[in-house]
C-alpha cells in the first residue's frame, strides 16, 4: 500500500488582515516538519529572488565623489544617497532609465519630485524627504533607475561608460519589506501532529502580496522540476544529438532576440508595443495577455494580431524564457 502524504486543500487568505501591502497566508494540514521546510524556502525566495525597481546611481552637478557637501543644500551627499536608497517604485519597464531634475529656491526635495518620462515608473512613497535646498540655490541631479533582483552593492553597480561624477548606490531591488512564518500544530481526524504554516508577507506596494507568493512559488517550482524529472539512468546522447539540441537552443534564443519591428504588425500595434518598451519577441512572449490589455490603446484586435504572429513561430504569451538568458 502506497502511503499518501497529507497535503493542504488550498492556501487560505486571512481576509481580516489583508491589505494592498500585507497578506497572511495559511497552509494546512502539512506533514510534520514540512511547515518549517516550506516556510524557510518561501521566505528566502521572497526576500532574495523577486524582481523590483530601485535607484542604482546618481550624478549631482558640481559633485565628483560621494563624500562631498553641496553648496546651498542642507544635506551632504551621503545623506542624500541614503534617502534615495529608500525610494520605492512601481515600474513596467525592463531596462534602466534616467531622469533629470532641477530643484531651485527654498524647496523640500521629496521622492514625489522624481518624475518619469512617458510613464516609465511610478514613485510609491512620494512624501519621502530627499534633501532641502536653500533660498537662491539650485540642485541639478540625474537619477539612474534600474531593474534587478534582491540586493546589489554599489561596487557591483557601476556600468561602463558612466559620466564623471556618477555615484553608484547600493540597490535594494526586492519589493518585499518583511517575511515571517510560524508553525502550529493542527488536527486531522484523530491525529494532532500535523502542522499549520502561517506566512506573513509585507510588500512595498509595487506588487500585491498574493502575486508575490505566486511568483515565489513559480520560481521554486521551476527549480524543483529538474529534480522531479530526474532519472538515474540518463539517456546517452550522440555527438550529433547534442549538436542538434545546441542548434535548437541557439535558434530559439536568436528568435527571442528578434526585434518587434521585424514582425509584420500594424502601425497601431507597433506603436503600443514601443510605448510599453517591448522591443523584442522575448519581451513580448514573457508578458501575459491581461498584462498587455492594460497598456494604453492596446485592445483585443491588437492582441489577436500578435497571437497570429506568435503562432507562426510556435510561440505564445506567458512563456518562461529565463533559460535563454534574455537581457
Swiss-Prot record:
Catalysed transformations (reactions): RNA(n) + a ribonucleoside 5'-triphosphate = RNA(n+1) + diphosphate
Record InterPro entries: DNA-dir_RNA_pol_insert, DNA-dir_RNA_pol_RpoA/D/Rpb3, DNA-dir_RpoA, RBP11-like, RNAP_asu_C, RNApol_insert_sf
Top-level taxon in the UniProt lineage: Bacteria
EC numbers on record: 2.7.7.6
GO terms for cellular component: cytoplasm; DNA-directed RNA polymerase complex
CDD domains reported in the protein's UniProt record: RNAP_alpha_NTD (cd06928)
Region Alpha N-terminal domain (alpha-NTD): start-end pairs: 1-231
UniProt keyword terms in alphabetical order: DNA-directed RNA polymerase, Nucleotidyltransferase, Transcription, Transferase
Gene Ontology BP annotations: DNA-templated transcription
One annotated GO molecular function: protein dimerization activity
Domain description: The N-terminal domain is essential for RNAP assembly and basal transcription, whereas the C-terminal domain is involved in interaction with transcriptional regulators and with upstream promoter elements.
Purpose: DNA-dependent RNA polymerase catalyzes the transcription of DNA into RNA using the four ribonucleoside triphosphates as substrates.
Self-association state and partner proteins as the record states: Homodimer. The RNAP catalytic core consists of 2 alpha, 1 beta, 1 beta' and 1 omega subunit. When a sigma factor is associated with the core the holoenzyme is formed, which can initiate transcription.
Membership in a protein family: Belongs to the RNA polymerase alpha chain family.
Full protein name: DNA-directed RNA polymerase subunit alpha
Organism: Chlorobium phaeobacteroides (strain DSM 266 / SMG 266 / 2430)
Amino acid at each position: 500500500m502506497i502511503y499518501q502524504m497529507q497535503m493542504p486543500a488550498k492556501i487560505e487568505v486571512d481576509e481580516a488582515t489583508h491589505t494592498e501591502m500585507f497578506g497572511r497566508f495559511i497552509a494546512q494540514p502539512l506533514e510534520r516538519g514540512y511547515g518549517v521546510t516550506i516556510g524557510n524556502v518561501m521566505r528566502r525566495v521572497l526576500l532574495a529572488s523577486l524582481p523590483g525597481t530601485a535607484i542604482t546611481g546618481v550624478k549631482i552637478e558640481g559633485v565628483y565623489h560621494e563624500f562631498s557637501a553641496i553648496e546651498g543644500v542642507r544635506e551632504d551627499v551621503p545623506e542624500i544617497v541614503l534617502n534615495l536608497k529608500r525610494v520605492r517604485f512601481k515600474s513596467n519597464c525592463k531596462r534602466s532609465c534616467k531622469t533629470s531634475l532641477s530643484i531651485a529656491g527654498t524647496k523640500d526635495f521629496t521622492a514625489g519630485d522624481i518624475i518619469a518620462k512617458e510613464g516609465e515608473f511610478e514613485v510609491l512613497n512620494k512624501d519621502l524627504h530627499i534633501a532641502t535646498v536653500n533660498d537662491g540655490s539650485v540642485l541639478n541631479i540625474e537619477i539612474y533607475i534600474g531593474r534587478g533582483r534582491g540586493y546589489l552593492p554599489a561596487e557591483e553597480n557601476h556600468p561602463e561608460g558612466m559620466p564623471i561624477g556618477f555615484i553608484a548606490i547600493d540597490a535594494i531591488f526586492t519589493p518585499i519589506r518583511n517575511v515571517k512564518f510560524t508553525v502550529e500544530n493542527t488536527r486531522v481526524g484523530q491525529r494532532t501532529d500535523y502542522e499549520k504554516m502561517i506566512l506573513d508577507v509585507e510588500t512595498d506596494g509595487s506588487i500585491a502580496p498574493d502575486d508575490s507568493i505566486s511568483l515565489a512559488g513559480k520560481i521554486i517550482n521551476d527549480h524543483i522540476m529538474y529534480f522531479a524529472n530526474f532519472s538515474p539512468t540518463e539517456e546517452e546522447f550522440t555527438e550529433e544529438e547534442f549538436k542538434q539540441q545546441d542548434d535548437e537552443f541557439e535558434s530559439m534564443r536568436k528568435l527571442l532576440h528578434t526585434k518587434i519591428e521585424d514582425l509584420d504588425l500594424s502601425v497601431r500595434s507597433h506603436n503600443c508595443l514601443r510605448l510599453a518598451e517591448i522591443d523584442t519577441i522575448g519581451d513580448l512572449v514573457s508578458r501575459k495577455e491581461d498584462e498587455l490589455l492594460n497598456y494604453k490603446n492596446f485592445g483585443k484586435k491588437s492582441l489577436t494580431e500578435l497571437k497570429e504572429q506568435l503562432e507562426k513561430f510556435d510561440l505564445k504569451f506567458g512563456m518562461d524564457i529565463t533559460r535563454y538568458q534574455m537581457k
